[in-house]
Curated annotation (Swiss-Prot):
Chain positions with Phosphoserine modification: 14
Taxon lineage: Eukaryota, Metazoa, Chordata, Craniata, Vertebrata
Quaternary structure and interacting proteins, as annotated: Interacts with DHCR24; this interaction regulates DHCR7 activity. Interacts with TMEM147.
Name of this protein: 7-dehydrocholesterol reductase
Domain of life: Eukaryota
Residues annotated as binding NADP(+): 358, 362, 395, 400, 407-408, 447, 451-455, 462
Main localization, broad class: endoplasmic reticulum
UniProt source species: Bos taurus (Bovine)
Gene Ontology MF annotations: 7-dehydrocholesterol reductase activity; cholesterol-5,6-oxide hydrolase activity; NADP binding
Name of the coding gene: DHCR7
Length: 475
């Protein structure tokens, strides 16, 4: 399920008798070839309960004022039955299906038919046709980077409708939120199933497919590494960025419009949530080329985890703060609001500058200054699946000398700010920081396991130079 990543590479596995960093030569990349019992249990748990978790949170707001405990208490004491809760849940509607179909169609058209022009006039922005990382099969895929353009055009249409055209109400997303949930699930399951069938019958590159022999694991984690239709429609890039992340800011705007409609004003907490989350969304699309070197693209196969997660989990659970504020319009004291804003901006600064330092170091091959000094690095080497020897440098200067994943630390600070903007009245808006802490800690450990196998003894030298993962002096 989508989240901010750090530059990564295909996973490797240590094998006795192999030289340092040579495991990749044995085909150990991407997700696991074999499934242990814990991984299988985790996969089955997520397949069964992740859709229920999304439904429970949205239902709790719709029927119980965003309380997570009252529905359980009502069921436990007999004051409500599951059938009663389900009966009060809005079903899928023809209107919601039309809205969602139009939305996805628009994003596909913007992705496929409109080459990027933003890079021609925006200084510093890298768009247009770009190359990704070397794949396990030794290929270098090309991508049309036009996410920022799609975001700008989509929001231009949104504001033109709101202020000039009047084709639909700005509250249209909130007003159809649960019916749209069923549509998002249909797309999520459809694309995940199609991707699995494609991996078996007509993969883009059969050398980059993995089969464990376990249906549930293959479905969840994916079979194909880089599934594509034609030359340019890349499943990972499209579903990671569109339709979920482009929609993120539109969803928040619709929630703000609903707050205005219900109460006659928009609270400073809603403004904070819209601003802080919009900063992340814009950062994602401004740095979409950098995203090609992250874990999602360079490590994960495309399965239900990404397909359903990007269609359902991301747009519905990452926007809980705005949804909560529709039901509970919190007006924060000025000092508190400023504190939340500063926390969010500081977290973003750390997140962005940490990634910028690594990107600068890689682009210049170390011929640069970080914090006014020549950067230091640990020299590493590894072998890719095609047998070629590669050399890398692991940066140990700047923020990368503070902790090995300090970009995640900044990410968590920003995530906490989103939640703090909602005050302390309910647990529901704090789900995001809890989820992100678990997700990023898991990614941190997973990436370190992969790097330890990939770089071997060189990784030990790196961890000795930078001993902490996320929190200096603690973890």
């Amino acid at each position: 399920m989508a989240a901010k990543s750090q530059p990564s590479a295909p996973k490797t596995k240590s094998t006795s008798g192999l030289t340092n960093g040579n495991a990749a030569a044995q085909g150990q990349w991407g997700r696991a070839w074999e499934v242990d019992w814990f991984s299988l249990a985790s996969v089955i748990f997520l397949l069964l309960f992740a859709p229920f978790i999304v439904y429970y949170f949205i239902m709790a707001c719709d029927q119980y004022g965003c309380s997570l405990t009252v529905p359980v208490a009502d069921l436990a004491t007999g004051r409500a039955r599951l059938a009663d809760i389900w009966a009060r849940t809005p079903p899928v509607t023809a209107k919601a299906a039309q809205i969602y179909t139009a939305w996805v169609t628009l994003q596909v058209l913007l992705y496929m038919l409109l080459p990027d022009f933003c890079h021609k006039f925006l200084p510093g922005y890298v768009g247009g046709v770009q190359e990704g990382a070397v794949t396990p099969a030794g290929a270098v895929n090309k991508y049309e980077i036009n996410g920022l353009q799609a975001w700008l055009l989509t929001h231009l249409l949104w504001f033109a409708n709101a202020h000039l055209l009047g084709w639909f109400s700005p509250t249209i997303i909130f007003d159809n939120w649960i019916p749209l949930l069923w549509c998002a699930n249909i797309l999520g399951y459809t694309v995940s199933t199609f991707a699995m069938v494609k991996g078996y019958l007509f993969p883009t590159d059969a050398r980059e497919c993995k089969f464990t022999g376990n249906f549930f694991y293959n479905y969840m984690m994916g079979v194909e590494f880089n599934p594509r239709i034609g030359k340019w429609f890349d499943f990972k890039l499209f579903f990671n960025g569109r339709p979920g992340i482009v929609a993120w800011t539109l969803i928040n705007l619709s929630f703000a419009a609903k707050q205005q409609e219900l109460y006659g004003h928009v609270t400073n907490s809603m403004v904070l949530v819209n601003i802080l989350q919009a900063i992340y969304v814009l950062d994602f699309f401004w740095n979409e080329t950098w995203y090609l070197k992250t874990i999602d693209i360079c490590h994960d196969h495309f399965g239900w985890y990404l397909g359903w997660g990007d269609c359902v989990w991301l747009p519905y659970l990452y926007t809980l703060q705005g949804l909560y504020l529709v039901y509970h319009p919190v007006q924060l004291p000025t000092y508190y609001a400023l504190g939340v804003l500063l926390l969010g901006l500081l977290g973003y600064y750390i997140f962005r500058m940490t990634n910028h330092q690594k990107d600068l170091f890689r682009r210049t091959d170390g011929r640069c200054l970080i914090w006014g000094r020549k950067p230091k690095a640990i020299e590493c080497s590894y072998t890719s699946a095609d047998g070629q020897r590669h050399h890398s440098k692991l940066l140990v200067s700047g923020f990368w000398g503070v902790a090995r994943h300090f970009n995640y630390t900044g990410d968590l600070m920003g995530s906490l700010a989103y939640c703090l903007a909602c005050g302390g009245g309910h647990l529901l808006p704090y789900f995001y920081i809890i989820f992100m802490a678990i997700l990023l800690t898991h990614r941190c450990l997973r990436d370190e396991h992969r790097c330890a196998n990939k770089y071997g003894r060189d990784w030990e030298h790196y961890t000795a130079a930078v001993p902490y993962r996320l929190l200096p002096g603690i973890f």
